[in-house]
C-alpha cells in the first residue's frame, strides 16, 4: 500500500477492531540470477514455529526458506523492537506507556558478503540456458565458491510479494524441476574429467610418472 492508501485506512480502522496495518520488509534482488544460492524467504510455518526454541517468531513473520537466506537466518533477521502504546476507546494512539521506558529499538540484521562473482554467475546461467545441468567454480587457494549454477533456474523475484505462493506452486509443478538445486542435490558420475585431477595426484605422490605407472 502507498502512504496515501495507508492514511485512508488509518482514518477508518477504529471502526474495525482487530484490524491494523503492519509494515514489513520485502527482499529486493539486484540481479535476476543465483536464485538457488540465495534462496528465498516466506511466512513462517506452524512446524517452524514449533521448532523455534527461542520463541522469536509469531504468525506472519518471514523466515529464510532456502539457500543462504535459510542458512544465515539468525544473522540476517536482526532483532525485533518493542513499543508499548496507549490508545483511547476508539483505538487511536495517545502516546507511549511510561514515556517509552519499556520500549526497545529494533536492531537491523547483519550484512552478508558472498564470494560469488556475479559476472561469472550470470555467464554460467547464460551457458546453461535451456539446458539441464550445473556449474560450480571454486577458487583452489581459498575454497571460495565463485559461481553456483543450476539449470533450469528461476527468477528470484518470483518468490517475493503476494504472488509468492502461486509462483512457488507453478515452479513446483514444472516438469523440468527448476526448484531442484542440481549443483548441490544432483548426483552425477565425474567421468573422464576426473582423470586429470587423479593423474596429478598420482604424480604429486610419486605413485607414477608422466609416461605411465
Model-identified regions with their sequence ranges:
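Periplasmic/cell-envelope proteins involved in peptidoglycan metabolism and beta-lactam response
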Residues: 1-165, 187, 204-212
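Short active-site loop at a secondary-structure junction
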Residues: 113, 168, 172-194, 211-213
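Extended, hydrophobic alpha-helical segments in both membrane/secreted and soluble proteins
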Residues: 145, 193-203
Amino acid at each position: 500500500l502507498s502512504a496515501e492508501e495507508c492514511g485512508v485506512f488509518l482514518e477508518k480502522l477504529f471502526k474495525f477492531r482487530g484490524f491494523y496495518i503492519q509494515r514489513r520488509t520485502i527482499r529486493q534482488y539486484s540481479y535476476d540470477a543465483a536464485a538457488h544460492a540465495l534462496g528465498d524467504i516466506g511466512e513462517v510455518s506452524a512446524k517452524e514455529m514449533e521448532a523455534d526454541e527461542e520463541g522469536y517468531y509469531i504468525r506472519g513473520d518471514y523466515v529464510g526458506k532456502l539457500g543462504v537466506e535459510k542458512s544465515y537466518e539468525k544473522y540476517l533477521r536482526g532483532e525485533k523492537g518493542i513499543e508499548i502504546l496507549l490508545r483511547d476507546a476508539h483505538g487511536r494512539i495517545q502516546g507511549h506507556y511510561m514515556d517509552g521506558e519499556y520500549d526497545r529499538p529494533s536492531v537491523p540484521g547483519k550484512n552478508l558478503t558472498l564470494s560469488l562473482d556475479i559476472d561469472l554467475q550470470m555467464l554460467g546461467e547464460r551457458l546453461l540456458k535451456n539446458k539441464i545441468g550445473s556449474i560450480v567454480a571454486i577458487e583452489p587457494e581459498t575454497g571460495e565458491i565463485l559461481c553456483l549454477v543450476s539449470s533450469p533456474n528461476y527468477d528470484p523475484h518470483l518468490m517475493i510479494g503476494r504472488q509468492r505462493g502461486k509462483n512457488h506452486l507453478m515452479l513446483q509443478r514444472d516438469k523440468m524441476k527448476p526448484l531442484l538445486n542440481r549443483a548441490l542435490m544432483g548426483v552425477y558420475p565425474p567421468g573422464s574429467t576426473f582423470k586429470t585431477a587423479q593423474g596429478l595426484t598420482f604424480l604429486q605422490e610419486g605413485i607414477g610418472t608422466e609416461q605411465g605407472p
